[in-house]
Design a protein with these regions (language model features):
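Short, Lys/Arg-rich flexible segments
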Residues: 1-139
Length: 139
């Protein structure tokens, strides 16, 4: 989706310039970009913990940033169906909890990543440089 243009209209001889659509777009894209970077970081930390035991589950770890709900999901793709057994544990195997540990042990780093995007809200030009529309698929 392209950046909405500025809307100009005249009313009673006064020209108004509205950047509401552009600002709404900018905020939503900054949120998405922050969530994508957070998801990328959490997946990387999860893969480091999983890779010690097996290699296949690490390849099936992925993140999804949903556009309408504007939230982040980190989980295992269908090829890593057994990942929930390692995450939660079974009767015979203790839980590893790689996803949970990746988030809980790195809360400061996650806050720092998202804080980068929040601090850019004041400057529109810097915000536009951070948003990368070509990058749509998570890994």
């Amino acid at each position: 989706m392209a950046v909405p243009s500025v809307v100009k209209f005249k009313k009673d001889g006064v020209e108004y310039t509205s950047k509401v659509d552009r600002t709404k777009y900018l905020l939503s894209e900054l949120i998405r970009a922050a969530l994508k970077d957070t998801g990328r970081y959490v997946c990387r930390m999860t893969r480091k913990q999983i890779r010690r035991r097996t290699g296949r589950l690490a390849k099936n770890t992925q993140y999804w940033v949903r556009r309408k709900r504007q939230d982040l999901q980190v989980g295992f793709k269908p090829g890593g169906w057994y990942g929930m057994y390692q995450e939660l544990g079974t009767e015979k195997k203790p839980k590893i909890g790689a996803l949970k540990n990746a988030v809980m042990l790195n809360l400061d780093e996650i806050r720092r990543i998202q804080g980068q995007y929040l601090s850019v809200i004041e400057d529109e030009n810097r915000a536009m440089n951070l948003i990368d529309e070509a990058e749509e698929q998570g890994q």
